[in-house]
């Protein structure tokens, strides 16, 4: 029987292999993984742990917070603030950045996260997850500022997500492909179950909320309409639609077997370039997809090359199988 490889061993081996992961980053990723295990435990309790329902508050985006949103956010902060690996954190659930208190050692990294993506699905027991991204803080001894987080996705040094479903699984990249780990609940550790995930360039599946079709721009309408025409249309093949309304769940499926995920701009909020957050969702997922051989675009530009202008910036998102993403970009007139 093959020896199982734990997340810790995997990270140590990556550290040894040409210094892909500095020691401080390795330790940070282990702490993030432990926090995800705690969140998984809280999620699995459901009604028995009094963690379902709303918290009676809103986040900076004006969205009603679930109890588990707040619990997961607190778990990630408390787990990471004292280890000496971080200088500051930013979360979809917080207005501003969280500076590591002076009483703790200051590290060289910045951690960004969506503590519980897809939280609208919590009460109906659909897969949800945590998305995270790691950046280096700028050089110097000065205190970290919000502008230090406004780095394009190309500067990420690690990114991943943890999905809480029938199994708890962790997808991770440090710039050398995507590895997938499964939580062994008996051992209490994440175990490597797949390396070098690859998204096929061609697909017959798309993920989008079709109920919003009347609000989309013409290029997205054209793309979806051609997919729906199936074998008798210009694409010459039948497509299936999949939509979980949980980005982590939809993207996990696409990383596992291919597909394209679209969350486009729509006319209901024309002043906003999209719905999903660039720093907490689009950048980490975009890097994972690219590391698996896929593509990530907002329709006109590679997502990872977008220069953020504020902490909670939103973007239009097209992620997944390379040929489909490029087709949607072509319809938008992207070069």
UniProtKB/Swiss-Prot annotation:
Transmembrane segments: none annotated. GO terms for cellular component: cytosol. Its EC number is 3.1.3.11. Its cofactor is Mg(2+). PROSITE patterns: FBPASE (PS00124). Binds 2 magnesium ions per subunit. CDD domains: FBPase (cd00354). It comes from the Bacteria. It is found in: Cytoplasm. GO terms for biological process: fructose 1,6-bisphosphate metabolic process; fructose 6-phosphate metabolic process; fructose metabolic process; gluconeogenesis; sucrose biosynthetic process. One of its GO terms (molecular function) is magnesium ion binding. Mg(2+) 2 binds at residues 114, 117, 281. It catalyses: beta-D-fructose 1,6-bisphosphate + H2O = beta-D-fructose 6-phosphate + phosphate. Mg(2+) 1 binds at residues 92, 114, 116. Substrate binds at residues 117-120, 209, 275. InterPro entries: FBPase_C_dom, FBPase_class-1, FBPase_N, FBPtase, Fructose_bisphosphatase_AS. Keywords: Carbohydrate metabolism, Cytoplasm, Hydrolase, Magnesium, Metal-binding. Homotetramer. Belongs to the FBPase class 1 family. HAMAP family: FBPase_class1. This is Fructose-1,6-bisphosphatase class 1. It comes from Verminephrobacter eiseniae (strain EF01-2).
């Amino acid at each position: 029987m093959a020896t199982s490889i734990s997340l810790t061993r995997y990270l140590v081996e990556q550290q040894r292999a040409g210094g892909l992961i500095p020691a401080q980053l390795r330790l940070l990723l282990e702490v993030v993984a432990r926090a995800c295990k705690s969140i998984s435990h809280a999620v699995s309790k459901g009604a028995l742990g009094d963690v379902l329902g709303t918290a009676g508050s809103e986040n900076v985006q004006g969205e009603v917070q679930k109890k588990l949103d707040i619990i997961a956010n607190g778990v990630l902060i408390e787990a990471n603030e004292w280890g000496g690996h971080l200088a500051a954190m930013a979360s979809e659930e917080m207005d501003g950045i969280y500076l590591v208190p002076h009483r703790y050692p200051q590290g060289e990294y910045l951690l960004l996260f969506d503590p519980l993506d897809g939280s609208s699905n919590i009460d109906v027991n659909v897969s949800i997850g945590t998305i995270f991204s790691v950046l280096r803080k700028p050089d110097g001894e000065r205190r970290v500022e919000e502008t230090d987080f406004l780095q394009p996705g190309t500067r990420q040094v690690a990114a991943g997500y943890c999905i809480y479903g029938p199994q708890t699984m962790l997808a991770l990249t440090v710039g050398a492909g995507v590895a997938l780990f499964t939580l062994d609940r008996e051992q209490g550790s994440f175990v490597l179950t797949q390396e070098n995930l690859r998204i096929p360039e061609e697909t017959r599946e798309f993920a989008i909320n079709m109920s919003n079709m009347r609000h989309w721009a013409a290029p997205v309408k054209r793309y979806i309409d051609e997919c729906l025409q199936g074998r008798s249309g210009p694409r010459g093949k039948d497509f299936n639609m999949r939509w979980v309304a949980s980005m982590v769940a939809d993207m996990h499926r696409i990383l596992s077997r291919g597909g394209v995920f679209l969350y486009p701009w729509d006319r209901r909020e024309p002043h906003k370039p999209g719905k999903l957050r660039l720093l907490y969702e689009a950048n980490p997922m975009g890097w994972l997809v690219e590391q698996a051989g896929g593509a990530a675009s907002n329709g006109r530009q590679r997502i990872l090359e977008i220069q953020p202008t504020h902490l909670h910036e939103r973007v239009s998102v097209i992620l997944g199988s390379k040929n489909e993403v490029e087709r949607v970009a072509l319809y938008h007139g992207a070069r």
